[in-house]
């Protein structure tokens, strides 16, 4: 009982309990939210009967064979590159305990299987960046590593990094990270938020893996013109310490900025999943340039298209219909358009994670995390290529590994 009172009043022995409380709080939030979708061993049963038992290439594109796909998965720490026929072209072994030193802030015994390569970035010379995320245990995220094409480690930056990364034309690396804090926020309009809690950051890292800058997302919002209107919503967010859950950082290029008068070259688009919100921040001034909500919910992978439209993976905006959507939003007119939401014989619903890629000729490459599925649609929304990753439970071939990062390339890009 005294332990419980010490937590509420922040008195002795609260400081002694702090470490375990932080871990328990972070783990509780993620596990309870996801437990109905994710199995403990990293395998999942596809959400639709149409996809159960499907393995490998299921729809072949004979009209365009210049297709290479890179993907990471939830099981074996191997990054694979396949061709248009689904044949393995190359692989990188990025096993964390074999390749990396355990970060000193990880004080728990965590299994290797829980440290997963969440996002990858492939350089033309075969080097690869990997973000290591501790699934269901964000406080134990491992960091970012760079490997060469032979899977030799080039550098490793420990840190609680997570979700997606982006790389600017100049080679700077943009990523998300968090701290687990045990004191109240000192920023304006956050007096109602009590610890333990996550504080979320944008990190800018140079090509040698050295941290150049760290920007607090909450601090930036609290000092913006959006602060009072937005931050009170955190009180109602059922996030138990994970108040924002940022899951995308996207660098706005000069070509993209030229098509949107609101944003500038070098701005960063950040998706905040817990509050169904998207922000645009100037990393030089740390000012919030734009903040908005829309007809989406639980969104991931939010980017700016070459036409200057915000485009996102809307995981839960059509949850009642059991659909996810690829959605385009114009921040100037506030008009939105659904680019894809599945077909009757090819249902599309990914409640967590997942990503997409805008391709020439209005094609879209889509990664559906839970189903272990990657596919490409044409301008008429027809599926022209489909592949289910072949990593399956040895005891049940209907259980598949999840696919995290799925990215499409042409031969000239490799």
Predicted segments with their positions:
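Histidine-/acidic-rich catalytic cores in large beta-rich domains
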Residues: 1-414
């Amino acid at each position: 009982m005294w332990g419980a009172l010490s937590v509420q009043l922040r008195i002795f022995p609260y400081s002694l309990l702090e470490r375990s409380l932080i871990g328990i709080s972070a783990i509780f939030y993620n596990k309870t939210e996801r437990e109905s979708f994710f199995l403990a061993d990293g395998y999942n049963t596809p959400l639709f009967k149409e996809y159960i038992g499907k393995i490998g290439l299921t729809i072949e594109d004979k009209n365009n064979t210049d297709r290479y796909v890179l993907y990471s998965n939830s099981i074996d720490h191997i990054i694979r590159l396949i061709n248009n026929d689904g044949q393995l072209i190359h692989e990188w072994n990025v096993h964390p305990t074999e390749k990396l030193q355990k970060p000193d802030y990880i004080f728990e015994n965590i299994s290797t299987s829980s440290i997963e390569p969440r996002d990858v970035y492939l350089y033309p010379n075969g080097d690869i960046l990997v973000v290591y995320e501790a699934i269901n245990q964000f406080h134990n995220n491992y960091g970012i590593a760079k490997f060469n094409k032979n899977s030799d480690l080039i550098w490793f930056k420990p840190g609680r990094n997570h979700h997606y990364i982006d790389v600017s034309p100049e080679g700077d690396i943009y990523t998300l990270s968090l701290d687990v804090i045990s004191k109240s926020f000192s920023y304006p309009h956050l007096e109602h938020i009590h610890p333990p809690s996550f504080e979320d950051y944008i990190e800018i890292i140079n090509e040698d893996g050295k941290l150049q800058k760290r920007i607090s997302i909450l601090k930036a919002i609290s000092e913006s013109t959006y602060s009072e209107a937005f931050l009170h919503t955190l009180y109602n967010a059922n996030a138990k310490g994970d108040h924002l859950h940022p899951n995308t950082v996207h660098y706005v290029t000069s070509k993209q900025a030229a098509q949107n008068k609101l944003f500038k070259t070098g701005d960063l688009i950040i998706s905040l999943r817990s509050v169904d919100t998207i922000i645009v921040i100037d990393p030089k001034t740390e000012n919030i340039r734009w903040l908005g909500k829309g007809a989406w919910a639980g969104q991931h992978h939010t980017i700016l298209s070459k036409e200057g439209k915000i485009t996102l993976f809307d995981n839960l905006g059509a949850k009642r219909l059991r659909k996810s959507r690829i959605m385009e939003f114009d921040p100037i007119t506030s008009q939105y358009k659904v680019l894809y939401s599945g077909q009757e014989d090819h249902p599309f619903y990914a409640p967590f994670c997942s990503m997409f890629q805008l391709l020439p000729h209005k094609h879209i490459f889509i990664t559906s995390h839970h189903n272990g599925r990657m596919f490409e649609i044409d301008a008429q929304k027809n599926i022209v290529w489909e592949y289910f990753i072949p990593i399956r439970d040895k005891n049940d071939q209907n259980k598949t590994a999840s696919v995290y990062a799925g990215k499409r390339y042409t031969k000239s890009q490799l």
